[in-house]
Curated annotation (Swiss-Prot):
It comes from Chlorobaculum tepidum (strain ATCC 49652 / DSM 12025 / NBRC 103806 / TLS) (Chlorobium tepidum). GO terms for cellular component: cytoplasm. HAMAP family: UPF0235. Belongs to the UPF0235 family. InterPro entries: DUF167, YggU-like_sf. It comes from the Bacteria. This is UPF0235 protein CT1832.
């Protein structure tokens, strides 16, 4: 199963976040989810905001195009990305993660 799915016009991305990391970035796969490390603490929505900003930058879309669909208070989240195709998301992930993303995608 892939962490990428399509729901209507948007792409859904299943992620697992690790707040309070030493550095922010996409860390690889966590089972069937994309693992994202965040410097922010999960307080006052800071980690969710950082997660959306990080993915928006990685996918080349505006920050407003990325939102948390499910799991706002959980480490496991489903993010909705508008203005991009599943193939473009997959390509961006492969560019960031190499072979590990291809295995999960």
């Amino acid at each position: 199963m892939s962490p990428i799915s399509q729901k209507g016009e948007a792409v859904c991305l299943s992620v697992r976040v690790q707040p309070r990391s030493s550095k922010s970035g996409v860390a690889g796969m966590y089972g069937e989810q994309l693992k994202i490390c965040l410097k922010s603490a999960p307080v006052d929505n800071a980690a969710n905001k950082e997660c959306c900003e990080l993915l928006a930058k990685a996918l080349g879309v505006p920050r407003s195009s990325v939102s948390v669909m499910k799991g706002a208070s959980s480490r496991s989240k489903v993010l909705k990305v508008e203005g991009v195709t599943p193939a473009a998301v997959r390509e961006a992930l492969v560019g960031m993660l190499g072979d590990e993303a291809e295995a999960g995608a």
